[in-house]
């Protein structure tokens, strides 16, 4: 049953709540449990919707863990979706992470640019721009997701220097043919 609700066994690699430390030099920090969409391939369905933002105390424990483990050079902010956290709180979390000298890379795993493109605002971009280098790992699974609004939001992120990558999930009947993948 545990592998059904937690198929990647993330809970087994959590030295502190909401922080997965599976690989020596990187961690996954879950900062909230809200998503703009529930993906059929989600490996964290057990968490989605339970209280939204992770508590400040839990985040403090995660950030302190990163600070105290100098082998960690890369953090992936995830959740839920980090971009559903209010701007002020996201700014605070990024400032804390960026203050850690040995942390070289901050990645944000998000579906917001493709599912809630109106969230990509000038204010959000001004916050993100302060914390370079930042990298976005997004999910786009079909070319129809790339609407004009989505393209505008992605362009705003690219214009402030954020590299944008897509973690495309191969889905039967959706994108499992070469023509669709080529177009995507």
Annotate each language-model stretch with its function.
Residues 1-28, 46:
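N-terminal [4Fe-4S]-dependent radical SAM core
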Residues 60-74, 83-184:
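Conserved AdoMet/S-adenosylmethionine-binding subsite of the radical SAM
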Residues 18, 52-53, 67:
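Domain-level signature for proteins that mediate thiol-based redox and metal-cofactor handling
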Residues 2-4, 49, 107-111:
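N-terminal start-of-chain detector that recognizes signal peptides
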């Amino acid at each position: 049953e545990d592998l059904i609700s937690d198929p990647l066994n993330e809970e087994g690699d959590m030295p502190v709540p909401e922080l997965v430390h599976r690989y020596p030099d990187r961690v996954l920090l879950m900062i909230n449990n809200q998503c703009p969409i529930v993906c059929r391939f989600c490996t964290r369905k057990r968490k989605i919707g339970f209280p939204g933002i992770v508590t400040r105390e839990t985040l403090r424990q995660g950030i302190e863990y990163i600070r105290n483990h100098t082998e960690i050079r890369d953090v992936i902010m995830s959740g839920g979706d980090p971009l559903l956290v209010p701007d002020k709180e996201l700014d605070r979390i990024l400032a804390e992470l960026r203050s850690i000298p040995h942390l070289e890379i901050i990645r944000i795993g998000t579906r917001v640019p493709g599912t809630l493109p109106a969230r990509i605002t000038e204010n959000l971009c001004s916050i993100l721009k302060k914390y370079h280098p930042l990298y976005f790992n997004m999910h786009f699974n079909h070319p129809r997701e790339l609407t004009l609004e989505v393209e505008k939001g992605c362009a705003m992120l690219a214009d402030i220097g954020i590299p944008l990558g897509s973690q495309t999930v191969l889905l039967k009947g959706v994108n499992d043919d070469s023509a669709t993948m080529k177009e995507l």
